């Protein structure tokens, strides 16, 4: 059977593009350029793998620059007002009388970064294991709770 020329089906070139025998359900003509349904919907966390995290756009405090940096918009940064501490009823978890830990590096010119001090600390760790500092073992300033 010989195929019929297209001029017998349509009168103009625009009508040649349409397929009047294929229509959408609402009556629009189908031009063959789209597929059924929208395939470009946003990806959800249920569709991604276990490492996918989208977030909720809750903490966007700035913007990315085109050079890979990040500029913070200080109007979007959260600020918290602390209450006045005079006659404040809530108490801290840590006792206010706890002495601060002070590290002394006598005989080491580089302070905490001196290689001789690091070597000495490694030797002590090998011999004794992990040992708390003297200030941390002072239990006289501890307050028993409960």
Curated annotation (Swiss-Prot):
- Family annotation (Pfam families): MRP-L27
Q: Which domain of life is it from?
A: Eukaryota
A GO term for molecular function: structural constituent of ribosome
Mind telling me where the transit peptide is?
1-16
InterPro entries to which the protein is assigned, alphabetical = Ribosomal_mL41 (IPR019189)
Recite the UniProt keywords alphabetically.
Mitochondrion, Ribonucleoprotein, Ribosomal protein, Transit peptide
Q: Where is the signal peptide?
A: none
Is Mitochondrion found in the keyword set?
yes
A Gene Ontology biological process in which this protein takes part is: mitochondrial translation
Compartments it resides in: Mitochondrion
Q: Name one GO cellular component term.
A: mitochondrial large ribosomal subunit
PANTHER family, alphabetized: LARGE RIBOSOMAL SUBUNIT PROTEIN ML41, MITOCHONDRIAL RIBOSOMAL PROTEIN L41
Q: Which family does it belong to?
A: Belongs to the mitochondrion-specific ribosomal protein mL41 family.
Question: How is this protein organized at the quaternary level?
Answer: Component of the mitochondrial large ribosomal subunit (mt-LSU). Mature yeast 74S mitochondrial ribosomes consist of a small (37S) and a large (54S) subunit. The 37S small subunit contains a 15S ribosomal RNA (15S mt-rRNA) and 34 different proteins. The 54S large subunit contains a 21S rRNA (21S mt-rRNA) and 46 different proteins.
Function, in words: Component of the mitochondrial ribosome (mitoribosome), a dedicated translation machinery responsible for the synthesis of mitochondrial genome-encoded proteins, including at least some of the essential transmembrane subunits of the mitochondrial respiratory chain. The mitoribosomes are attached to the mitochondrial inner membrane and translation products are cotranslationally integrated into the membrane.
Q: What else is known?
A: Present with 2250 molecules/cell in log phase SD medium.
| Name of protein | Large ribosomal subunit protein mL41
What organism does the UniProt record list as the source? Saccharomyces cerevisiae (strain ATCC 204508 / S288c) (Baker's yeast)
Q: Name the gene behind this protein.
A: MRPL27
